[in-house]
């Protein structure tokens, strides 16, 4: 069979009582609901708190008008409120969305599960139908094959008959032919013979035609057979395809289910992510609340500062303020201590909540174990008296050992049964896996639902906390009410869990009872005839049990109600005002409960009456049947008398218990529960006895019916009588043992009372010692206050030192200023030297100019002489030519001199520009330094004023330490020496802190001494509690509650001690870290950034100075190193600040939890001293309104001081008392943990054994599956071989048909060969028929074998079902197993017969190979395949037999073990019945002990009431600490808002920087366009120069006279040569003139281009400087709000941009003006000039006009320059020397700066 052919089994797995995660899933559901509720409640709580805060702030705003800070805070709070409302809506939407998503996934899972079941059902139906169709098809195929064989036989017979006829006719023809050959024959005879021969030939032809028709029919039938074989093959192929399709479809559904599982996992992950996101939001809200609290503290400080200023106006007020500040410092220290206590309390509360959850899980686990033990005891011992005897020392060892043995035996039975179930459910493995996957989906769904439930529960918790914050006045009453609700809720949950477990247990009990009844039915043969009557008796028993269960449930409800009332009564005793009313109400309810209990008692009596009626009826029947047996009558009468005596005793016991319930209260309820269990067990025993009596009646009836078997029945009755006598004797022994136990318990109780009296005396002595210790602690605290005052004075001295250090820093800054002035003087000296050098250079230049002037004068003289000698030109032509040559040589020499001077001048101009640029930069840097220096001095002065104000305002230790840290940190950043001093001072602080820690350690040592004493007392109390714990199951429930409370308190005490030590060690450190975060972000980082700016500017200045001088290089390097160190320190500090910020946020929460615990400890005194509590509340209110009601504080301050001292004393006393109680609970919990660990180890050991057995069963199951798979594989291989054999046979058939046709053709030609072939054909046909018969027979056998294998699989399934029914019918299973063995033996015989038949087939095939050589190869292959098949079948048969034998041997062993265990259980039940009788006797003794226990229980109640009071007081303090936490959260939120404001300002600054950069880029592009335009102008000038080459000397001369002015300048630089253009000389040639003009224009254009490029570079440089400054300011703005500096830099940038725009506009105007003049030059003609040739005049005029315009522009720039001195030479013109002035230098410097900015912008792009 194939894997998918397995049908799903509907048999459920046998449940043995283990929990399959039901409780865990339920707990997770509730937890998810609680988490959702907590988150929702927290959001609502935050919204409500913000609304209240808005109301308060609005009230303050109405009181104090025109307060912008309050308006800002109100706006911030409104924004936060809207944000929280939106988050709450989003949370609701997400929750609903996830619920819808989960429901959709559930629907999908249900849909796919239904589809899967439907497909499985369809698959099963489809397979059944296909197998049926296949069987029908195979049957039809075999029928057709048989028909075909019959047709072939008929055809062969007809062919044989035709051949015989043909042979006969042929013989006749031959004979007639022989007669015709006789010569003696007559003509008539001859004719006659010829006619006969013709007829014979005609008949022969007819016969041949018939033979051909038969062969055609034979071929048609063969084709039909082949087509049928093909159809069969197609059917098999379709089956395989259908199987493949089904597998594919099945796999797709499995994939879809896996996808659904993945989706569910993803949704679960999404839920987890959402939960984490919500938790992050909650953390953010906490941080926001803390920030708000910090902001409120800042506001309070500002208000206190204002009050201090108003109070400092009068001197007498100042004197009073000094004293008040001292007291304020003390209060602040106490406030810090309370704050730390609150933090530690909050941490402890969180840990206690976690521990409560763990403890709840632990209780659930213990409850499961207890219920499991209870179920075991109900099944095995049929009594619950063992719980009472469990805590008794004498009976403890015996009951424990026997109970463990019973548990082990029953677990082994359960293990065996589970092993049988696992073996029997092999066929339904896939269905089980699918069921498990669906169960996993359900579990995941339950987990998701539970998560939502936990979230809802979290929301509810948040709402509760919010209501608690709103109702501060009713904190105590509401806390008590909430505690009651929580206790009631937990009790309800536990009751629900108990009911669920009880239902499961009842189901298991019913199943086991049913199983045991069936075993009893099979054990006795005579019970088969009495099934109807026994069924009636069983129904009556079940009805009675149901009624008894109803009564028990009612009693449980009454007990729970009574327990609740008792708890409320005990809790409300503490409330003095309402105690009387509640007592009356509770007493009335208690009386009503007593009445209901009486009604239940009446119902119980009615139940007993019904039982008595049934017993009477049974007695009547028994008397009628046992008239002949007087011995049996006497026995039954005595048993009835004993039963009545037991009933009377039981009634008396119940009456006594009911009387004692009024006194015992809550403890007596548990005892009444045990009495009910005892009555239930007695009733069950009575029913068992009645059942045995009915069995006796049945035996008596059988005696009447069957007189012959009377002796056998008498023997059975005698045995039953003996068993009854044994039980009666065991009951008497149990009564005696109970009486002995009662006496022993009385003795132990008397001893216990004596020990309690001794311990009370010891308690009194301990209380006296604790009072003395509290007084000592008070004295120690006063000493500590004195120490703090001394430390305060020391700190004032340190502050003075710090002021001195600040003055030293100022002195250092002044020294630095002087050093920079010295550097400036040196730079001035160097500039003076450079100026002298320039003057020397100017003197040389003047000498050259004098020479040029002489040349000019000579030129003028020459001109005069030339005009005078015009008439004499011819005469003096030769002299003129010689003179011309002479002056040409002289001009060439002067030209060389000009070029040299030009080079020198260019070098000098470059040096001059560089020096002036450097000088201007130095001046700017010096101005910037002066400004920064003034800013630093102003900042230092402001800092000094702030320090003075802070010293006058607040003398708190915390602020003084912070200022000290800031001053030391600034000192560290300034110099390395200051850093060392800071480290020394910090070391001193550490030493002081260690001294303080040592003082705290001394306190801890004293506390440890007290804890040792408390532990000793706890050890004694532990013995008392252990002794009380041994009193029985009647105190079990209450002891569990008390242990849970004790464990919580003990855990709280441990955590308090740990947190207290940690807090003492890190108290000052954490306070310093808190102030570091707040102050470093607001003040220290500002100072660091300012220092960094100064160092950066110094660095740039020093870099520039270093370019010119190397005097201060060492100082620069030292400052650079210092700056790098400070920058690293700043980065490290910023990283540490960020890390500490996150760390301290966590520490704030831990401090909050610690403070919460401390405040809970302090709140204990409120219950005992109501008046003092009211005064302390007034003091807290006065502390919160200290700023508004400061005058009233002055009067009441001394009184409050004394009250606080008293509060500290009472706090110490309460702490010591609490420590004692907690240490006692600690010892008790340790003992309980040891017992729990022992039980846990036992359970784990038994679990390991079960696991080992379960693994063995799984291995056997896997082996069986492997064998099944191997059988299936072998079956498929055999089927494949058979199909191959059938194909070979078909091939042989085709070959045989071909051979038959060849034989038929040869028969016509050769008669002799025909006979032989006919003989061979007959023989082959016969052999073929034999082979076909054998093949068909083999196929039938194969089919039978396959059917047998299938039947064997079906039988295995049937046997598995029968083995499952083995739990119900063991005897019937034995017979079925025997039948199975017989069937397997028959199958074994069938397999052997098949093997023999196959051997016979092999022999026949061997004989056939000898006759037919053509088929030897095929037959050998068939033989080999058959041999292999037979070997495999034999091997499979052997393995199958081995597996079956193993299984049945294992089943026999299991059956024997079950029978052995049942016998052991019977023996144990007998022993437990005997022990139960003893326990009944001991129960009577326990009734006497109740009176002695009452007094002790009252003492325990008083002690527990005290513990409850302590818990109530701690809850009150917890609420007050929650309020302080909320204030801290608000302060944290204010810090977050400040950070957000800083980020927003940074973003605005970045935007402005980007806009400025874009503007600079635009200006740069404009300058670049100007450069391009200058290049175009240069090209135009080049073209004009080319035109001037063609002009003549005369036109040039005339143009020069008309247009050129006497002074010509280019760009403000004096030209060294007076005549700039060579055409001024009429003696020179035209080529020289054009070259010189071209050179001059090129020089002019190059100079202008260089000037523009210099301006561009300057703009780029300035832009880089501005970007650096912007980056610095951006860094500063990320840490602090430096809007003022940003505005300054922004204004500077705007001014520079305006300057650049103005300069660029000037350049644009100049260039546009030049272009306009060039374009308009053609139309412009001066009046004094009339050119001769038009084209020459226009070109010359245009060029000269441009030169004039350029010269005018330069003159306009130099209009304030004086004209230099001129030395006359013998020439006609003189050019004065004009130098540069400071205004042009400044203008060039600004243009250069703009160019640098633009160039830097271009480079950055």
UniProtKB/Swiss-Prot annotation:
The lineage's top-level taxon is Bacteria
The entry's keywords? Coiled coil, Cytadherence, Virulence
Which ranges of the sequence are coiled-coil? 28-838, 914-1591, 1632-1723, 1777-1804
Q: Which GO terms describe its biological process?
A: adhesion of symbiont to microvasculature
Known InterPro entries for this protein? Cytadherence_Hmw2
The function of this protein is:
Component of the cytoskeleton-like structure which stabilizes the shape of the wall-less Mycoplasma. This cytoskeleton-like network of accessory proteins containing HMW proteins 1 to 5 allows the proper anchoring of cytadhesin proteins in the mycoplasmal membrane at the attachment organelle.
What protein does this entry describe? Cytadherence high molecular weight protein 2
The gene it comes from is hmw2
């Amino acid at each position: 069979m194939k894997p998918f052919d397995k049908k799903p089994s509907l048999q459920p797995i046998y449940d043995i009582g283990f929990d399959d995660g039901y409780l865990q899933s339920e707990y997770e559901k509730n937890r998810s609901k609680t988490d959702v509720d907590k988150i929702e409640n927290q959001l609502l709580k935050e919204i409500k708190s913000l609304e209240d805060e808005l109301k308060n702030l609005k009230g303050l705003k109405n009181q104090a008008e025109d307060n912008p800070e309050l308006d800002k805070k109100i706006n911030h709070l409104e924004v936060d409120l809207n944000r929280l409302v939106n988050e709450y809506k989003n949370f609701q939407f997400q929750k609903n969305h996830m619920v819808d998503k989960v429901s959709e996934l559930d629907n999908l899972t249900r849909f796919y599960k239904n589809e899967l079941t439907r497909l499985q059902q369809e698959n099963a139906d489809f397979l059944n139908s296909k197998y049926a169709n296949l069987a029908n098809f195979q049957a039809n195929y075999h029928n057709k094959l048989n028909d075909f064989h019959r047709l072939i036989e008929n055809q062969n017979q007809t062919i044989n008959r035709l051949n015989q006829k043909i042979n006969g006719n042929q013989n006749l023809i031959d004979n007639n032919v022989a007669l015709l050959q006789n010569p003696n024959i007559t003509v008539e005879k001859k004719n006659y013979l010829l006619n006969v021969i013709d007829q014979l030939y005609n008949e022969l032809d007819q016969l041949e035609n018939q033979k051909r028709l038969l062969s055609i029919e034979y071929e048609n039938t063969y084709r039909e057979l082949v087509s049928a074989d093909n159809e069969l093959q197609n059917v098999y192929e379709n089956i395989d395809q259908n199987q493949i399709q089904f597998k594919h479809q099945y796999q797709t559904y499995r994939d879809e289910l896996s996808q659904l599982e993945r989706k569910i996992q993803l949704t679960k992950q999404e839920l987890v992510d959402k939960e984490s996101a919500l938790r992050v939001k909650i953390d953010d809200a906490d941080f926001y609340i803390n920030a708000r609290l910090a902001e409120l503290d800042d506001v309070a400080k500002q208000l206190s500062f204002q009050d201090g200023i108003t109070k400092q106006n009068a001197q007498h007020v100042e004197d009073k303020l000094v004293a008040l500040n001292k007291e304020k410092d003390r209060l602040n220290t106490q406030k810090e201590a309370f704050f730390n206590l609150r933090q530690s309390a909050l941490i402890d509360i969180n840990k206690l909540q976690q521990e409560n959850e763990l403890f709840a899980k632990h209780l659930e686990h213990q409850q499961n174990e207890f219920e499991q033990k209870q179920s075991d005891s109900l099944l095995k011992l049929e009594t619950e008296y063992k719980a009472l005897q469990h805590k008794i020392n004498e009976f403890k060892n015996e009951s424990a050992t026997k109970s463990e043995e019973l548990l082990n035996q029953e677990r082994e039975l359960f293990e065996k049964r589970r092993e049988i179930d696992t073996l029997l459910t092999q066929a339904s493995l896939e269905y089980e896996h699918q069921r498990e996957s669906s169960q996993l989906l359900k579990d995941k769904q339950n987990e998701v639902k539970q998560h939502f439930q936990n979230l809802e529960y979290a929301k509810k918790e948040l709402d509760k906390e919010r209501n608690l914050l709103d109702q501060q006045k009713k904190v105590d009453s509401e806390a008590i009410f909430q505690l009651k609700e929580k206790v009631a809720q937990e009790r309800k949950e536990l009751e629900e869990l108990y009911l669920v477990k009880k239902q499961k247990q009842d189901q298991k009990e019913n199943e086991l009872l049913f199983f045991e009844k069936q075993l009893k039915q099979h054990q006795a043969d005579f019970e088969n005839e009495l099934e109807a009557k026994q069924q009636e008796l069983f129904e009556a028993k079940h009805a009675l049990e149901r009624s008894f269960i109803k009564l028990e449930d009612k009693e449980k409800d009454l007990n729970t109600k009574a327990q609740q009332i008792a708890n409320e009564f005990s809790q409300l005793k503490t409330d003095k005002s309402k105690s009387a009313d509640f007592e009356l109400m509770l007493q009335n309810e208690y009386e009503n409960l007593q009445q209901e209990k009486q009604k239940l008692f009446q119902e119980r009596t009615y139940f007993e009456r019904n039982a008595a009626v049934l017993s009477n009826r049974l007695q009547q029947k028994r008397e009628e049947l046992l008239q002949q047996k007087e011995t049996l009558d006497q026995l039954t009468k005595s048993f009835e008398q004993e039963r009545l005596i037991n009933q009377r005793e039981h009634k008396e016991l119940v009456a006594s218990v009911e009387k004692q319930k009024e006194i015992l209260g809550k403890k007596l309820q548990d005892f009444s529960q045990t009495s009910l269990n005892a009555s239930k067990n007695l009733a069950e025993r009575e029913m068992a006895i009645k059942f045995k009596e009915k069995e006796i009646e049945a035996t008596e009836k059988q005696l009447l019916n069957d007189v012959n078997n009377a002796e056998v029945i008498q023997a059975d009755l005698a045995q039953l009588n003996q068993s009854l006598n044994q039980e009666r004797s065991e009951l008497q022994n149990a009564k005696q043992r109970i009486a002995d136990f009662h006496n022993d318990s009385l003795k132990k109780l008397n001893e216990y009372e004596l020990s309690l009296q001794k311990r009370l005396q010891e308690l009194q002595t301990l209380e006296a010692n604790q009072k003395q210790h509290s007084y000592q602690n008070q004295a120690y605290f006063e000493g500590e206050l004195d120490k703090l005052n001394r430390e305060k004075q020391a700190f004032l001295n340190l502050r003075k030192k710090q002021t001195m250090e600040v003055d030293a820093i100022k002195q250092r800054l002044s020294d630095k200023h002087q050093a920079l002035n010295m550097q400036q003087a040196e730079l001035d000296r160097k500039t003076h030297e450079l100026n002298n050098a320039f003057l020397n250079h100017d003197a040389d230049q003047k000498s050259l100019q004098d020479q040029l002037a002489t040349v000019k004068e000579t030129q003028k003289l020459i001109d005069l002489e030339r005009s005078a000698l015009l008439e004499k030109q011819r005469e003096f032509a030769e002299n003129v030519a010689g003179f011309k040559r002479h002056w040409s040589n002289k001009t060439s020499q002067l030209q060389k001199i000009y070029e040299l001077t030009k080079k020198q001048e260019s070098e000098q101009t470059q040096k001059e520009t560089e020096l002036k640029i450097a000088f201007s930069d130095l001046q700017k840097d010096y101005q910037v330094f002066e400004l920064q220096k003034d800013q630093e001095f102003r900042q230092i002065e402001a800092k000094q004023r702030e320090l003075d104000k802070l010293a006058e305002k607040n003398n708190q230790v915390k602020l003084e330490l912070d200022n000290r840290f800031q001053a030391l940190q600034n000192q560290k950043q300034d110099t390395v020496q200051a850093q060392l001093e800071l480290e020394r001072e910090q070391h001193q602080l550490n030493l002081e802190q260690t001294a303080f820690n040592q003082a705290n350690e001394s306190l801890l040592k004293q506390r440890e001494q007290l804890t040792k004493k408390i532990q000793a007392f706890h050890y004694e109390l532990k013995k008392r509690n252990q002794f009380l714990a041994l009193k029985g199951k009647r105190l079990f429930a209450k002891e569990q509650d008390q242990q849970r409370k004790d464990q919580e308190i003990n855990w709280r005490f441990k955590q308090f001690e740990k947190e207290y030590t940690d807090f003492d060690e890190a108290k000052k450190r954490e306070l310093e870290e808190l102030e570091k975060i707040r102050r470093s972000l607001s003040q220290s980082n500002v100072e660091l950034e300012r220092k960094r700016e100064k160092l950066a500017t110094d660095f740039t200045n020093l870099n520039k100075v270093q370019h010119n001088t190397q005097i201060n290089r060492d100082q620069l390097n030292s400052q650079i190193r210092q700056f790098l160190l400070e920058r690293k320190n700043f980065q490290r500090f910023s990283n540490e600040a960020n890390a500490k910020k996150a760390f301290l946020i966590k520490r704030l929460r831990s401090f909050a939890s610690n403070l919460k615990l401390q405040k809970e400890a302090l709140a204990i005194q409120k219950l005992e001293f109501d008046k003092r509590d009211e005064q302390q509340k007034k003091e807290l209110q006065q502390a919160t309104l200290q700023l508004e009601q400061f005058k009233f504080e002055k009067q009441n301050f001394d009184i409050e001081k004394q009250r606080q001292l008293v509060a500290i004393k009472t706090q110490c006393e309460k702490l010591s008392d609490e420590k004692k109680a907690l240490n006692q609970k600690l010892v008790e919990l340790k003992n309980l943990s040891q017992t729990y660990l022992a039980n846990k180890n036992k359970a784990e050991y038994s679990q390991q054994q079960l696991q080992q057995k379960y693994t063995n069963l799984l291995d056997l199951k896997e082996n069986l599956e492997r064998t099944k798979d191997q059988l299936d594989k072998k079956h498929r291989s055999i089927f494949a071989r058979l199909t191959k054999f059938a194909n070979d046979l078909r091939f042989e058939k085709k070959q045989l048909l071909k051979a038959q046709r060849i034989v038929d053709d040869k028969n016509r030609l050769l008669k002799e060969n025909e006979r032989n072939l006919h003989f061979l054909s007959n023989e082959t046909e016969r052999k073929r028929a034999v082979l076909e018969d054998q093949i068909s027979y083999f196929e039938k056998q194969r089919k039978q074998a396959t059917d047998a294998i299938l039947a064997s699989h079906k039988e295995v399934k049937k046997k598995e079902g029968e083995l499952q029914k083995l739990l119900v019918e063991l005897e019937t299973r034995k017979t079925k197993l025997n039948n199975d063995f017989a069937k397997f033996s028959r199958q074994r015989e069938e397999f052997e017969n098949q093997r023999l038949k196959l051997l016979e087939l092999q022999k026949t095939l061997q004989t056939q190979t000898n006759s037919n050589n053509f088929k030897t190869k095929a037959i050998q292959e068939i033989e080999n395949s058959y041999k292999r098949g037979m070997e495999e079948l034999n091997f499979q048969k052997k393995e199958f037999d081995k597996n079956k034998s193993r299984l049945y041997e294992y089943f026999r062993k299991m059956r024997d073990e079950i029978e052995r265990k049942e016998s052991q259980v019977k023996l144990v039940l007998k022993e437990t019945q005997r022990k139960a009788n003893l326990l009944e006797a001991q129960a009577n003794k326990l009734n006497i002990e109740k009176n002695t226990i009452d007094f002790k229980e009252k003492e325990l109640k008083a002690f527990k009431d005290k513990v409850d009071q302590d818990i109530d007081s701690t809850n009150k303090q917890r609420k007050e600490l929650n309020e302080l936490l909320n204030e801290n959260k608000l302060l944290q939120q204010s810090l977050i808002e400040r950070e957000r404001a800083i980020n927003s300002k940074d973003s605005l600054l970045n935007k402005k920087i980007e806009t400025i950069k874009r503007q600079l880029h635009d200006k740069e592009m404009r300058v670049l366009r100007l450069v391009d335009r200058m290049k175009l102008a240069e090209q135009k000038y080049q073209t004009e120069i080319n035109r001037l080459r063609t002009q003549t000397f005369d036109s040039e001369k005339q143009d020069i006279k008309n247009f050129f002015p006497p002074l010509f300048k280019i760009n403000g630089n004096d030209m060294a040569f007076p005549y700039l253009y060579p055409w001024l000389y009429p003696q020179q040639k035209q080529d020289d003139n054009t070259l010189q003009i071209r050179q001059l224009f090129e020089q002019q254009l190059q100079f202008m281009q260089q000037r523009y490029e210099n301006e561009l570079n300057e703009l780029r440089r300035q832009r880089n400087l501005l970007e650096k400054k912007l980056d610095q300011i951006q860094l500063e703005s990320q840490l602090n709000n430096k809007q003022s500096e940003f505005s300054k830099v922004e204004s500077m940038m705007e001014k520079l941009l305006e300057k650049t725009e103005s300069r660029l506009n000037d350049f644009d105007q100049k260039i546009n003006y030049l272009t306009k003049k060039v374009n308009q030059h053609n139309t412009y003609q001066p009046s004094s000039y009339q050119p001769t040739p038009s084209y020459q005049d226009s070109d010359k005029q245009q060029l000269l006009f441009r030169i004039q315009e350029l010269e005018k522009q330069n003159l306009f720039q130099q209009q304030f320059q004086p004209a230099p001195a001129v030395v006359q030479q013998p020439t006609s013109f003189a050019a004065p020397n004009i130098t540069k002035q400071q205004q042009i230098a400044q203008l060039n410097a600004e243009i250069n700066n703009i160019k640098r900015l633009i160039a830097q912008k271009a480079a950055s792009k």
